[in-house]
Amino acid sequence: MLALTRKAGERIVIGDNIVVTVVSIKGDSIRLTIDAPKEVKIYRGEIYDAIAAENKEAAVPMDLTELTALKEFHIRK
């Protein structure tokens, strides 16, 4: 992990195509802009964590009897 200290107006460049700029600092809040290609997904940490939790919950293994019942339903049609 890299920890950096930046002042308002200063930038951090990540790779060749991502630039993070410190816009302002007020109290304990920092306002950033992130310039990145559209294909780079950018999430706030709490949103990313919520998405990961939803994906993990959705990936619960299925009971094989459910799949068998689905196959039988398709055959009866």
Curated annotation (Swiss-Prot):
Function of the protein: A translational regulator that binds mRNA to regulate translation initiation and/or mRNA stability. Usually binds in the 5'-UTR at or near the Shine-Dalgarno sequence preventing ribosome-binding, thus repressing translation. Its main target seems to be the major flagellin gene, while its function is anatagonized by FliW.
HAMAP family registered for this protein in UniProt: CsrA (MF_00167)
Alphabetically ordered keywords of this record: Bacterial flagellum biogenesis, Cytoplasm, Repressor, RNA-binding, Translation regulation
Gene3D superfamilies: Translational regulator CsrA
Gene this chain is encoded by: csrA
The family this protein is said to belong to: Belongs to the CsrA/RsmA family.
Designated name of the protein: Translational regulator CsrA
Disulfide bonds: none
Subunit structure: Homodimer; the beta-strands of each monomer intercalate to form a hydrophobic core, while the alpha-helices form wings that extend away from the core.
Highest rank taxon of the organism: Bacteria
GO MF, one example: mRNA 5'-UTR binding
Record Pfam families: CsrA (PF02599)
GO cellular component: cytosol
Main location: cytoplasm
Species whose genome carries this gene: Desulfitobacterium hafniense (strain Y51)
GO terms for biological process, alphabetical: bacterial-type flagellum organization; mRNA catabolic process; negative regulation of translational initiation; regulation of bacterial-type flagellum assembly; regulation of carbohydrate metabolic process
UniProt-annotated location(s): Cytoplasm
